[in-house]
Amino acid sequence: MLFHAKLALRSVCDITPELLGKLGVRGLLLDIDNTLTTHDNPTPAPGVEGWVAGMQAAGISLCLGSNNHPPRVEPFARRLGLDFVCEGKKPLTKGYREAVQKMGLSRKEVAAVGDQIFTDVLGANLFRVPCIFVFPMEMEKTKFFKFKRRMEVPFLPRKIYEGPEVAKSGRQGVDSI
C-alpha cells in the first residue's frame, strides 16, 4: 500500500473544503511541479490562485513541499502567499515533518497532494498522512521522467474520485501514461 494514494482527482482545483472536512484534513502539503503548474513554470496554472484563496478563506492551511531548490520554490511560494519547504528530499519524511510544523497542525490533520507515485505518494505514506493523487498537468520530456512515469503505471489509481464534494474543474490532466 506504500504506492497507493487515499484518493485520486484530475486536478488540485477539484479539492474542496467539503472534501477535506470529510477526510478530517485541515492542512495540505502541496507539490509544485505538475500539481500547481507545469514543470519549472514560474506561474501557477489557471485557477490555482483562486483555489488557494478559497482554501485559505475556508481556514485550510497550505504549505508547498518540493524537492526543488530555493530559487525555484521561493518565488512561486511568494506569488501564492504560502509557506514552503524546499529541498524536501521526498520520499524521505524530513520535508513532510517540517511542513506540518510550519502549519502548526498534527499529522492527523494533514494530507499531501502530488502527481508522482515514487515521491509524493510514497513519501506521504512513509510519513503516515493520506495522499491525494492528482494526475500530472503535462508529461515531462526528459528520459528520466519518461522512465519514471512508465514505472508508475502499475500503481496509478484506476478510478478518479467524483463524490458530491469534489469541484469539477474540467481540466483533463494526463490520465494515461
Please identify what each model-predicted range represents:
Residues 2-30, 41-42, 46-60, 65-112, ...:
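Asp-based, Mg2+/Mn2+-dependent phosphohydrolase catalytic module
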